[in-house]
A protein has these predicted regions:
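Short glycine/proline-centered loop/turn elements that form peptide/ligand docking sites
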Residues: 103, 107, 131-134, 151-156
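A short, well-structured alpha-helix characteristic of acyl/acetyltransferase catalytic modules
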Residues: 1-52, 171-179
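Acetyl-CoA-dependent GNAT
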Residues: 40-98, 113, 169-173
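Glycine-rich phosphate/pyrophosphate-binding loop shared by adenosine-nucleotide-utilizing enzymes
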Residues: 16, 69-73, 161
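Conserved acetyl-CoA-binding loop-helix of GNAT-fold acetyltransferases
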Residues: 100-113, 136-140
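Conserved GNAT acetyl-CoA-binding A-motif
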Residues: 116-126
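Conserved active-site tyrosine of GNAT-family acetyltransferases
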Residues: 138, 143, 166
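Conserved catalytic-core motifs of GNAT/GCN5-like acyltransferases
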Residues: 124-127, 144-161
């Protein structure tokens, strides 16, 4: 990872942490994502494509870690203009960690930090329309559907796919079982 990580938070969740990658972890995480059938379907099977997430100047990447090691990644991009104080979020978990509530809990933890500590008033996320499991998880956290962006993102098959635009305002984060 070529970007500095000193500014990134370490956030403690229930059974997991969100933290910056440690030296040597990025290559292992990229390999895990690109070889995982579920994660690679959404994040890509090409290691160079996934590695770009870790190298983008405006994207901050945290690992979702358990005692067993990295379970996935969660990213955020901040808009720091005081008139548009918002952030975009994305998350990708390895297939053996999906369906256990970890993704929703990680999103909830990061959302609260972005609202309470970073002062954002709005968060956005933009899953593929076809990624119904992710959409349900985001709604459980408090994200609301606001529209569809047609042919928004090129998929692994080389064609453009629609994405669902979702947002959440400060004060709308839902606790477990509320969504």
């Amino acid at each position: 990872m070529s970007r500095p990580t000193e500014h990134l938070p370490v956030l403690a969740g229930d059974g997991f942490d969100l933290r910056p990658p440690r030296p040597g972890e990025v290559a292992r995480v990229v390999e895990a994502i690109t070889s995982d059938p579920v994660a690679s379907a959404w994040w890509g099977a090409d290691p160079a494509v996934v590695m770009r997430w870790f190298e983008e100047d405006d994207v901050d990447v945290l690992l979702v870690c358990t005692d067993d090691g990295p379970a996935g990644i969660i990213t955020y991009t901040e808009v720091n203009d005081p008139d548009y104080r918002s952030a975009g979020i994305d998350i990708g978990l390895l297939s053996d960690r999906i369906g256990r509530g970890m993704g929703s809990a990680a999103l909830r933890l990061l959302a609260r930090w972005l609202f309470e500590e970073r002062g954002h008033h709005r968060l956005t996320i933009d899953p593929a329309v076809a990624n119904e499991r992710a959409v349900r998880a985001y709604e459980k956290v408090g994200f609301k559907r606001i529209g569809v962006a047609r042919q928004y993102e090129r998929g692994n098959d080389g064609t453009y796919h629609d994405n669902l635009l979702m947002d959440m305002l400060a004060g709308e984060v839902l606790g477990p079982g509320e969504g």
